UniProtKB/Swiss-Prot annotation:
This is Cyclopropane mycolic acid synthase MmaA2. It is an enzyme of class 2 (transferase). The active site is at residue 269. It comes from Mycobacterium bovis (strain ATCC BAA-935 / AF2122/97). Its EC number is 2.1.1.79. The gene is cmaC. PANTHER family: CYCLOPROPANE-FATTY-ACYL-PHOSPHOLIPID SYNTHASE. It catalyses: a 1-acyl-2-(9Z)-enoyl-sn-glycero-3-phospholipid + S-adenosyl-L-methionine = a 1-acyl-2-(9-cyclopronane)-acyl-sn-glycero-3-phospholipid + S-adenosyl-L-homocysteine + H(+). It holds the Pfam family CMAS.
Length: 287
């Protein structure tokens, strides 16, 4: 357990508050910034992102009137889908000012009696009881030293039949890379340092074992783990392709340096997923 549970606002805002207009250049219309799920080969990126959201929500056992907490809610696509498909109330947490403003605007435009809130806050600051929790692409930002606290908080606010769906990038230990026959190259070391310092400051993907062991210690039971590894390589390929197609706009919105940095990040990460250095998994955790 760590004593200071202040959310990592600065680390997250350094990436996600770059510019909504910039992210729109390469994300799909739902503005979902995580691995898509290509159920069919002919799916568009938008269709595959909705399929990923449906895959995650479908594992939660949602019932009308329940309250769903979305930790690291991004631009709100998962919550809007949950309202539309499951008639549930939603609460979203984000550390990004841009995302919070975008989600609030989209909520204000919805015609529904269901309760919908977005808070500029981290899970560390949230103590309300909820029925289900979904977290897609946020756990990587928490830091290894907060895993135990995160699972304890999730367990505390869920009911006896509660479910947490955790979708996160997962990494390998150095020994696991050796065991899998993956070379520990200078390019790999430099690229991982680049990601940690210039793209996702503070980011620390867990290993699969970390998630399973820490969640179990808190009282969660892993009922399913599903890897989407090849799907993330394809997602990143499509993001890189879209950003490249909008190069002049990207440079106008940000700069050539930012454009080149993001192209390096997107193409390099696609390679990591394709080769197998990193994975992405959905963990279904029952209380």
């Amino acid at each position: 357990m760590v004593n200071d549970l202040t959310p990592h606002f600065e680390d997250v805002q350094a990436h996600y508050d770059l510019s909504d207009d910039f992210f729109r250049l390469f994300l799909d219309p739902t503005q979902t910034y995580s691995c898509a799920h290509f159920e069919r080969e002919d799916m568009t990126l938008e269709e595959a992102q909705i399929a990923k959201i449906d895959l995650a929500l479908g594992k939660l056992g949602l019932q009308p009137g329940m309250t769903l907490l979305d930790i690291g809610c991004g631009w709100g696509a998962t919550m809007r889908r949950a309202i539309a498909q499951y008639d549930v109330n939603v609460v979203g947490l984000t550390l990004s000012k841009n995302q919070a403003a975008h989600v609030q605007k989209s909520f204000d435009e919805m015609d529904t009696p269901l309760d919908r809130r977005v808070l500029l806050a981290g899970w560390e600051q949230f103590n309300e009881p909820v029925d289900r929790i979904v977290s897609i692409g946020a756990f990587e930002h928490f830091g290894h030293d907060r895993h135990a606290d995160f699972f304890a908080r999730a367990h505390k606010i869920l009911p006896p039949d509660g479910v947490l769906l955790l979708h996160t990038i997962t990494g390998l230990t150095r020994q696991q890379m050796v065991d899998h026959g993956l070379p520990l190259t200078l390019w790999l070391a430099r690229f991982l340092k680049f990601i940690a310092t210039e793209i996702f400051p503070g980011g620390q993907p867990p290993t699969i074992e970390m998630v399973e062991e820490q969640s179990a210690k808190t009282g969660f039971t892993l009922t399913r783990r599903q890897s989407l590894q090849p799907h993330y390589a394809r997602t990143l390929d499509l993001w890189a392709e879209a950003l490249q197609e909008h190069k002049s706009e990207a440079i106008a919105i940000q700069s050539e340096e930012v454009y080149e940095r993001y192209m390096k990040y997107l193409t390099g990460c696609a390679k990591l997923f394709r080769v197998g250095y990193i994975d992405v998994n959905q963990f279904t955790l029952a209380k």
